[in-house]
């Protein structure tokens, strides 16, 4: 039986770390003039995938 393919969209969005998976925040690509500076600052950087979603991400990336 052939190997299962990873979901390429998920592979672009999530990275495996020692503590789980990291991802970038949404709503930070365009039409940012309406958004306050505070909101844009809060959306900077990466965050961890919520523990309830880790199993889904692992299944999409074929981790385990």
From Swiss-Prot:
GO CC terms, sorted: cytosolic large ribosomal subunit
Protein keywords: Ribonucleoprotein, Ribosomal protein
Keyword Ribonucleoprotein: yes
Entry superkingdom: Bacteria
Gene Ontology molecular functions: structural constituent of ribosome
UniProt xrefs under SUPFAM superfamilies: L35p-like
Keyword Ribosomal protein: yes
One record GO biological process: translation
S-S bridge residues: none
Region (Disordered): 1-23
InterPro entries listed in its UniProt record: Ribosomal_bL35, Ribosomal_bL35-like, Ribosomal_bL35_CS, Ribosomal_bL35_sf
Family: Belongs to the bacterial ribosomal protein bL35 family.
HAMAP family: Ribosomal_bL35
NCBIfam families attached to this UniProt entry: rpmI_bact
Protein name: Large ribosomal subunit protein bL35
Organism taxonomic ancestry: Bacteria, Pseudomonadati, Pseudomonadota, Gammaproteobacteria, Pseudomonadales
Primary gene name: rpmI
């Amino acid at each position: 039986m052939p190997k299962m393919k990873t979901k390429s969209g998920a592979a672009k969005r999530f990275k495996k770390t020692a503590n789980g998976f990291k991802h970038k925040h949404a709503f930070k690509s365009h039409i940012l003039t309406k958004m306050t500076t505070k909101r844009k600052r809060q959306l900077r950087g990466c965050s961890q995938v919520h523990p309830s979603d880790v199993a889904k991400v692992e299944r999409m990336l074929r981790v385990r």
